[in-house]
Amino acid sequence: MSASLKHTPLAETHLAAGARMVDFGGWEMPLAYGSQLEEHHAVRQDAGMFDVSHMLNADITGPDATAFLRYLVANDVARLNTPGKALYSCMLNPQGGVIDDLIIYYFAPDSWRVVVNAGTAEKDMAWMARVAAAGNFDVVITPRRDLAMIAVQGPNARAKVWAARPAWQPASEGLGPFTAAILPEDTLVARTGYTGEDGFEIVLPASAAVALWQDLVAQGVRPCGLGARDTLRLEAGMNLYGQDMDELVQPNQAGLSWTVSLKDAERRFIGRDALEQFATPCAFLGLKLSERGVMRAHMAVRTPQGMGLTTSGTMSPTLGVSIAFARLPLDVQPGSAVEVDIRGKWVPALVCKLPFVRNGKAVEHS
């Protein structure tokens, strides 16, 4: 293992399984254990799992916890009032740019959990601390590096989790999307994910991670690496922070307007003024390449309405063609024919709505 990189509680387990390890946001993480293609298909057709312990869980507690979060993020946590209920939101800077995207869980009015990206965790914690201090919010922000997180995804994922941990089934069987069961011993079983498939993201003590991983392997859940995670999230139309949006990109430039709540006019969250006064929306849509080739990030897109740019791209294992996300002129419509600059050649592509894949099946685009 690399001494200069951070490691999750499952690092030695990955190495023992023959994983190819890479640097991801300062963490040594598995890229793949064998065939990335087979790992991708396992999630679409059966069940696969990912070590996502590099992401940071942080608890936000105190009398002002709810007010603090209503100011900190663009979505409105006030609509969460059932323990375990969650929402997805962006945390914005005063210019409306995205500092990070995160999931927020409600435990009680004075107790919340946020899950932030690995590469932005230190920046996020520093930003939250500054916001809390500047606003005199009575909150305590506690990073929980004592916890691990495993995402089990696929049509058979939940059944295999219950086979490995039968005691979790009664509390988690009836969960709807974006809802978690809060279990004893610092365990959270959430019906969330980053693949477009059903499944759970499980937060548990770091000391319990290896045993759960091994028990899931025994149930036939396939370990998957970051390579498959990226192709799965692209097919599912899910953004990657640092690639599809960053601090210079507003939510309405990344297909994330739905994560911004403007209903309460008195809730002046950070970045709201910029969104209301200086919004520069654009179309954020999918592209499917019409010929051979592979789209990647930062490729020019030529449309009748003007130029655009890809933000993420890959070869889709499910569709068998290259797919991409692109920021395009606002009046470009799904179904439009465009061209993508691939190594100096303009290759035709079709504009389509996201996602490309839903519940393991290709979404039909006219």
Swiss-Prot record:
Pfam families: GCV_T, GCV_T_C. InterPro entries: GCS_T, GCS_T_bac, GCST_C, GCV_T_N, GcvT/YgfZ/DmdA, GcvT/YgfZ_C, TrmE/GcvT_dom1. It comes from the Bacteria. One of its GO terms (biological process) is glycine decarboxylation via glycine cleavage system. GO terms for cellular component: cytosol; glycine cleavage complex. Its EC number is 2.1.2.10. It catalyses: N(6)-[(R)-S(8)-aminomethyldihydrolipoyl]-L-lysyl-[protein] + (6S)-5,6,7,8-tetrahydrofolate = N(6)-[(R)-dihydrolipoyl]-L-lysyl-[protein] + (6R)-5,10-methylene-5,6,7,8-tetrahydrofolate + NH4(+). This is Aminomethyltransferase. It comes from Bordetella avium (strain 197N). The lineage of its organism: Bacteria, Pseudomonadati, Pseudomonadota, Betaproteobacteria, Burkholderiales. The gene is gcvT.
